[in-house]
Amino acid sequence: MPSSLSGWRLGVLLALALSSVAHAAPDWSQLADAQTVEVISTEEDGGSRLTTVWIVVLDDQAYIRTSGTTWGDNVEREGKLRLRVPAGEYALRAEKVLSAAEVERVVAAFREKYGTSDVMAGLFRFGERRVFRLVE
């Protein structure tokens, strides 16, 4: 096979891969009522892990949370993830929220949004509570 043809195929594959992931953050206001989103994190071996999680939007900022999970370890280690929502897939940074006051605000927002489901899920959370802010 001529090298130009193999280069052409590689270019097409690369273009397809890059076109499927947007690099700007979604309109968070459109996700405020979403019950779940999909987080794609990168495993230590380079593989991908797909996890369905809850999301809250506060003051035009989106947050996800976890405790004692592999996907949370991946996100904390890498500082980034891909977020899959009905509008598409987005490559984002995930900043761990360190402010206790901000964590409590986010936890309260989860409790308000998800109600007794959040209370019940809380019974099965183990390990450090981690809240991540999603940013471009």
List where the protein language model places each region:
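Bacterial N-terminal signal peptides that target proteins for export
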Residues: 1-11
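Short, structured beta-strand-loop surface elements
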Residues: 68-136
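Bacterial N-terminal signal peptides
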Residues: 9-19
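Short beta-strand segments
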Residues: 34-67, 84
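Boundary at the C-terminal end of the N-terminal hydrophobic targeting segment
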Residues: 22-26
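N-terminal helix-cap/turn-to-beta initiation motif at the start of protein domains
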Residues: 28-32
